[in-house]
Structure formats: C-alpha cells, structure tokens
C-alpha cells in the first residue's frame, strides 16, 4: 500500500506532529470525502506501507524529525512557484525559507526523494509567459543541484478556484500558449540538466520530449526501496494521470497555505473552523468520531513482490 500525504492538504507544513503521532500509533482514521459519516481505519505499520508520498510547499516543520521516517520508503512532491503573496497568501519568504528548505531537505534525504513541482501555471497581466520563463530559470538555477526533475501543469478550473481567483483576472490559456511555455521551459530545463514532465495534461507535448508525470510513482519507489511493486494505475484519477493506486490520509478544507488556485479548499472560514478542531492526539486529522459515524478497517496489504526472480 502507498500512502498519499496528501493531495488534500499540506501535512508536512501544518500537521507533521500529528502525522508522527499516527506513525507511532501505526494507524490513522480518514473520513470518506463523499460520505463524511464513513470513516476508514488505515494500518500505518511498516509491514504494509510500501511507500509514502508527501505533498508540500513548506517542509520546515518536518526537517528535524526525518529520522523518524527511517522505517519507511518515501519521497516529497515539493511545489515551489514564482507567485507572490497575493496568490499564495500563507507561505513564508521563498528566498529566506522555502528555497533553503528545499536544498536542506535534498541534502538530508537525497535528490531522488525530492521532486520539484512548478504548478499550476496561469497567466494574467503580471504573470505573463515572459515572467514565468524568467523566474522558472531563476528557480531552476537554485534547485537543479537538489532534484532530478520538475513537474509542471496548467491551471484547471473548478467552481471554488474560479471564485477564489476572480480578483487575479486570469487569462485563459490557449493550446498555443501552453506549447510556447512548454518549449521555453524545456530549453531552460535542459540548460540545468532537469527532466521536465507534465501532471495530468490532456495536450500531447511529446514533440518537445515532455511526457505525462507519475506523481505517485511506482518506478521511483522501486529505485528508492530496491524492490518490485505489484501496483496498478489509480482508477480514481483522470485518464491522463500516471499515478499508481494510493490511499490519501488528508482532508479537504484544512490547508492553511492560502493558495487562491487551490482546488482542495472551498473557503477560508471552513479551513479556520476545521483547523480549530485539529487535535494532535486524535486519529482523525480534525474533529472526533461521533455516534452516527461508522468506522471500518480497510483491508490493506504490502504490494512488494517477494518472489525471487530467476537472476536473483
């Protein structure tokens, strides 16, 4: 089983102590986002957790506790863009905090365990194609020694993102603009020996040498863990998504990064209310189990292929 921690919220930044408590207890409770009264109990013991993918914009709260992950195979999806505080309202200084934390994380765990994400890309009067290219190059120069690749994507429109981003006056991206950005980013990435891929994009950028990313990546885990995994593509993701199956242990409306483009937060009020219900000792990310809730233990097993090959 692979754990996603989490597409729905920034666990390393805001819930790292809770997460380490869950590892000590070796289980976590997760509400079904489609039915909040259904709660899954997930085994977090190393014997069944084959890997953990952390999604974050700021891993600083975890940096002094990485040794507590030594029994697990893991890597980070680390989003670092060129947007300012009017877009990513809750992040600390990128030059003083975020970029140094990226570099430190890579030094401590290795560059193959830190994937840079520059996404989502959108355009307006300030954030033009030239702006993105200029600052993508700046970031690439600082991050290339500390990662193997960069994954990019273009902004997807959801009801809550359209509402939240209205003050930014976004210009819809045309296919030609996407291709222009891809072509220019590829040249920059090549300059710094970075592999470039895209996350769940419907357009084919193969002629630029850019393929679909596998953000929850079977091959990366096999390299890190030196094992073979019998895991299938995640059927719950879009067709263009290359991710393999995983269990997400986060919750929507809990991330305090304040990114206006975020699909996982519906309102700042909901985020604040849910964060106020966070308990470090609770098996749930926020709130508690109520009488009307039904808790069911998920049947999970290790997906590592234990059979010896002919050549082993």
Where on the chain are the PLM-derived regions?
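A C-terminal junction/extension of Radical SAM enzymes
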Residues: 176-242
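Short catalytic/ligand-binding loop motif for oxyanion handling, primarily in non-cytosolic enzymes
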Residues: 85-86, 122-126, 158-161, 204-208, ...
């Amino acid at each position: 089983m692979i754990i996603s921690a989490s597409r729905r919220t920034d666990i390393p930044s805001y819930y790292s102590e809770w997460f380490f408590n869950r590892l000590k207890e070796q289980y976590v409770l997760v509400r079904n986002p489609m039915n909040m009264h259904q709660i899954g109990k997930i085994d977090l013991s190393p014997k069944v957790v084959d890997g953990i993918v952390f999604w974050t914009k700021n891993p600083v709260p975890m940096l002094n506790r990485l040794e507590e992950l030594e029994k697990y195979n893991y890597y980070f999806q680390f989003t670092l863009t060129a947007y300012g505080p009017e877009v990513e309202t809750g992040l600390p200084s990128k030059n003083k905090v975020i970029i140094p934390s990226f570099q430190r994380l890579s030094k401590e765990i290795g560059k193959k365990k830190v994937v840079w994400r520059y996404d989502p890309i959108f355009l307006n009067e300030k954030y033009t194609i030239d702006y993105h290219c200029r600052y993508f190059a700046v970031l690439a120069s600082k991050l290339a020694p500390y990662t193997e690749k960069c994954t990019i994507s273009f902004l997807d429109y959801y009801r809550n993102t359209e509402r939240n981003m209205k003050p930014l006056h976004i210009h819809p991206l045309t296919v030609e603009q996407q291709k222009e950005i891809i072509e220019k980013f590829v040249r920059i990435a090549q300059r710094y020996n970075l592999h470039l891929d895209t996350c769940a994009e419907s357009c084919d950028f193969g002629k630029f040498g850019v393929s679909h990313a596998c953000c929850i990546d079977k091959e990366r885990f096999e390299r890190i863990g030196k094992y073979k995994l019998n895991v299938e593509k995640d059927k719950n993701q879009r067709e263009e998504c290359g991710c393999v199956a995983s269990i997400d242990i986060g919750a929507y409306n809990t991330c305090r990064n304040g990114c206006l483009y975020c699909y996982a937060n519906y309102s700042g009020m909901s985020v604040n209310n849910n964060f106020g219900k966070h308990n470090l000792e609770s098996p749930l990310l926020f709130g508690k189990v109520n009488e009307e809730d039904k808790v069911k233990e998920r049947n999970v097993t290790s997906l590592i292929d234990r059979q010896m090959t002919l050549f082993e």
